[in-house]
Each structure stands twice: as C-alpha cells, then as structure tokens.
Regions:
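Conserved beta-strand elements of the Class I
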Residues: 38-40
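Glycine- and acidic-residue-enriched helix-capping/strand-helix junction motifs
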Residues: 47-62
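Boundary at the C-terminal end of the N-terminal hydrophobic targeting segment
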Residues: 32-34
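Short beta-strand elements in bilobed, periplasmic/extracellular small-molecule ligand-binding domains
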Residues: 70-79
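A generic structural signal for short, well-ordered alpha-helical segments in conserved domains
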Residues: 61-65, 76
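N-terminal secretory signal peptides that target proteins for export/translocation
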Residues: 1-14
Length: 204
C-alpha cells in the first residue's frame, strides 16, 4: 500500500509541475504573431543499460505534448526511449538553435535518470558534474561508455546558450527537468527504487 501511495503522490507532483509550467506558457498567448513556439520533449522509461532503475519518464511525453498543443506550440519534437541517445539529443538541441529566431518561445523537457560524474574541468566546488542520462549511457564505466554518453551540465549549458543567443532578450527559454542528479532526492527507500529518477552512485 505504501508503494502504491508513493507512486500516486509522485505522479501527482510530476503532473502538477508540468501543469504549472503549461499555465505559465499560456500566459504568452497574446504575443505578436511573428513569435514562434518550439518544443523539445525527451522522455525515458527504458535504457540500453538494464542496471538503471525502473522509471516511467516516457509516460510524461504524451501528457506534455497534449498540453503544449493546447498552448498552440508550432513545432514539437519528441525523443522517447531508444530515440533519446546522446547523439540524437545533442542534434535536436543544435537543430533547435539553428531554427530559432529572435523572440521565439522555447520549451525543453527532460524526464529520465540523472547521475553525478567526476568534474573534468575544475568548475565545480564539490568536484562533481551533474548529468542527464540518455538512452545509451551506462551507470558504470564499461567498454560501451567511459562517460562520453552522459550529457553533463557543462554540455547542457553550451547547448542552451546557443539557443538563448538566437532568441535574444525578447525570447523565452523554459527548461523543465524531472530527474534526480545526485540520488539524494528520493521519495522512498531502496525497496521502492522504481520511482527514483537517479542514482547515488557516482560515475567514476
């Protein structure tokens, strides 16, 4: 019963966060016609590396998509499960930056796992980078992934900065991340890991 109640509570909070963001987006309905609304939605419930805990980030995609359509978004790109490799995510970001114009509204949503990594450039006080986990990223170093498949906060910053420069100060960039980057934000103990989006295991 406790697990069921936790899942219901978690799903409610996720829906509430998304609802609040969409209400925020609806506030831009009265903007000039030249302003274009673009969205990138990434949702993961399955991973190539099966050692990742079970989550349902892919289920967020249709919910968010439906709300964005109601908010009259012009273009919505979705990457779900095996589509959401690091290469495809980065490509989607770059294409979004390429197509974006001054004053556009950009909405980016990521639902999936997160993980800390050892900081490689010394810009983090705690010595750790946070990262999104694409479909092809592994929890532990292996022949298939030595960390290059993770999407670090440094990389995300570069990708977002490109978009921000294109839309300018008159544009709006909204980023929603439903993931646990360090493994400390959990709703329950290890026996209920199916609702934990992340890991407290650092990628070394």
């Amino acid at each position: 019963m406790r697990r069921k109640n936790n899942k219901i509570f978690t799903n409610f909070l996720t829906s509430l966060r998304i609802f609040i963001v969409i209400i925020y987006l609806f506030s831009f309905q009265q903007i000039v016609c030249a302003q274009i609304k673009r969205a990138l939605i990434i949702g993961l419930g399955k991973y190539e590396d099966r050692s990742w805990g079970k989550i349902n980030g892919d289920r967020d995609v249709p919910l968010v998509t439906s709300m964005l359509k109601k908010a009259r978004f012009n273009t919505i790109l979705t990457l779900v499960n095996s589509q959401a490799t690091k290469k495809k995510i980065v490509s989607a970001f770059n294409n979004l930056a390429l197509r974006s114009k001054k004053s556009d509204i950009i909405y980016i949503h990521f639902s999936g796992h997160g993980q800390q990594m050892v900081d490689v450039n010394g810009d983090e006080e705690d010595g750790k980078d946070e990262s999104w986990i694409p479909y092809d990223a592994y929890k532990r170093p292996c022949n298939k992934d030595h960390g290059e498949k993770h999407l670090s906060d440094d990389e995300i910053c570069v990708l977002l900065t490109k978009i921000k420069h294109k839309i300018g100060i008159s544009g709006k960039l909204i980023v929603v991340v439903d993931a646990c980057h360090s493994g400390t934000s959990t709703w329950s103990d290890n026996q209920e890991a199916d609702i934990i989006r992340g890991t407290n295991e650092i990628f070394l």
